[in-house]
Amino acid sequence: MTNYMFILSLLFLTGCLGLALKPSPIYGGLGLIVSGCIGCLMVLGFGGSFLGLMVFLIYLGGMLVVFGYTTAMATEEYPETWGSNWFIFSFFVLGLFMELVVFYLFSLNNKVELVDFDSLGDWLMYEIDDVGVMLEGGIGVAAIYSCATWMMVVAGWSLFAGIFIIIEITRD
């Protein structure tokens, strides 16, 4: 499981680097879509099946349409790729190298704690004698309607504002 999450985190950061170093709008959208899908797989890997599915459906349902529309408006006959400009490609390779260096430095201390599981008492569905059973699907529904309500409102508002920002940028 650790190797699975490590590979997913490297792919997630690679997608984020691809987004940050976009030579053409098509590849920026591709990097964002890859990062979003792999982020949802990371949520699934930590046991959040409902939350991972909801984020995946909302993300692909909403933002994929926006990126498809904007890349259709900003198409070029010969788009520049990541490998066509050595300056951009060198930053991409440098970013990947820095990811590996940071991971190596964190693994030297053996004190890497990705997720803090100390305050899970609120999320237990059924508890007998200090043993709690956690249902993943129900936890996702509870998280959306309890503590993540404002986060969902902010995410929806960000998507709504992002549509207008992208349309204004690509408008003639």
From Swiss-Prot:
GO MF, one example: NADH dehydrogenase (ubiquinone) activity
Transmembrane segments: 1-21, 26-48, 52-74, 86-106, 147-167
Enzyme class, UniProt record, top EC level: translocase
The enzyme's E.C. designation: 7.1.1.2
Alphabetical keyword list: Electron transport, Membrane, Mitochondrion, Mitochondrion inner membrane, NAD, Respiratory chain, Translocase, Transmembrane, Transmembrane helix, Transport, Ubiquinone
Cell compartments where the protein resides: Mitochondrion inner membrane
InterPro entries found in the cross-reference section: ComplexI_Subunit6, NADH_UbQ/plastoQ_OxRdtase_su6, Nuo/plastoQ_OxRdtase_6_NuoJ
One annotated Gene Ontology cellular component of this protein: mitochondrion
GO biological process, one term: response to cocaine
Pfam family, any one: Oxidored_q3
Reactions this protein catalyses: a ubiquinone + NADH + 5 H(+)(in) = a ubiquinol + NAD(+) + 4 H(+)(out)
Taxonomy, superkingdom: Eukaryota
Membrane topology according to the record: Multi-pass membrane protein
Sequence similarity: Belongs to the complex I subunit 6 family.
Description of how the protein assembles with itself and partners: Core subunit of respiratory chain NADH dehydrogenase (Complex I) which is composed of 45 different subunits.
Reported function: Core subunit of the mitochondrial membrane respiratory chain NADH dehydrogenase (Complex I) which catalyzes electron transfer from NADH through the respiratory chain, using ubiquinone as an electron acceptor. Essential for the catalytic activity and assembly of complex I.
Name by which UniProt lists this protein: NADH-ubiquinone oxidoreductase chain 6
Gene that this sequence comes from: Mt-nd6
